[in-house]
Amino acid sequence: MERIPYRDADLLLSVLGEHIGKELLTVRSGRKIPNRWKSSFLEGSILLGRIMKVKNHHVLTGVIAEKYVPYEQQYSPFMFLALEIFSKIPSLDRSSFNLLEKFLTSEHRAKDFDQLLVSFMINESLQPSLNSCVVCGEKREQFPISASVFLGGYVCSRCGSGDIELNQADYESLLRTYRKVGELTENMRSYWLDILESQLSTKFLSREGLK
């Protein structure tokens, strides 16, 4: 999640651990850590894997900096899916991690996950296109357009009416309206997850847990 400047021969890494929390690790090196490692590998787990395979580089210490404990004893399938999604993102900024942190400290309801999913995809510019109807795929000709919060995008006049009129490709307006409406339907949640899988060229195995 973060690379924290420390010393030429050491490096502090903040990583998301298997215990569903954040660990702060100190990497001790026998020689100066190459700059290409610090800049090329954005995921702490990848960098740690490289360091642990090279002579004179090893993890010196590790402490739990933060820990996120769900309200219920049993973990929600939405929580596993959220963690899998974030584990497959090449790099994350602080605002995206804050969305995950907020979800991990929530009650893990469908509504909580939907807020995370939509906010994250819009924040990372991974949302469905506003250039074609989300129902039939017909290309839009011009603005203004009718957009559906539940469908997650533009809806042409033949396929129904939306919840909001947009005068430009403005997902922030759609997101603000969505937050007032609440959770997605199961079909619409699946549609957004399909879009995310397509954008990331991957499949989320944890989706099976939602059935």
Feature annotation, model-predicted:
Residues 1-11, 16-211:
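Non-catalytic alpha-helical scaffolds and adjoining flexible linkers that form interface surfaces
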